[in-house]
Amino acid sequence: MSVSKPSVILSRRDMLSLAAGVACAGVLPASFARADVRPETFSSSEIVDNGHRFFGSVTRGLAEGVESANKRWGKPNAYILGQEGSGAFVGGLRYGEGTMYTRNAGKRPVYWQGPTIGIDAGLDGDRTMMLVYNLPEVEGIFRRYSGVDGAAYLIGGVGFTALNNNEVVVIPVRTGVGARLGMNLGYLKFTPEKTWNPF
């Protein structure tokens, strides 16, 4: 006499719950682990190539500026591509938003605030690239950075201004008129969410 095995019938809700559980088990631990992983570095050529695509032109100044920064601070282990403008100039401050990219720790949106000068108010929609050096982890970008003495320079129409907070160095890279005005940048504050508070 054979004994039939009981059949298991899963409802649609059970199947969706099971699928969600499997997805969470496979994804969430990895994403949390990446949050405190130290990002690996990028080569100069990778940064320059991404910069050329981002700004839409090939400039000698970008390559020379990146090489100069790398000689002083090593290789960047993150970079930010973003935009400032679209009504972002309020009370003498500049606001921006973008995405920070890393080689092995993923990417995430970032927002920043910093001072500007009067004639800067007409520059709507400036594209800005930022190089990040010595970033200990992805969340470590969220600090306030002050200017580094003697670390603002203009090469071939591309402006570089170094800012730091302890070991982490952030270098905004701008072209055209924004390159010259970026030299006056006194500080930048990065936040995980958009805010109008610059302090």
Enumerate the predicted regions with their spans.
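N-terminal secretory signal peptides
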Residues: 1-14, 18-30
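Sec/Tat signal peptide C-region and signal peptidase I cleavage site
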Residues: 31-35
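Small-residue-enriched, tightly packed secondary-structure blocks
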Residues: 36-199
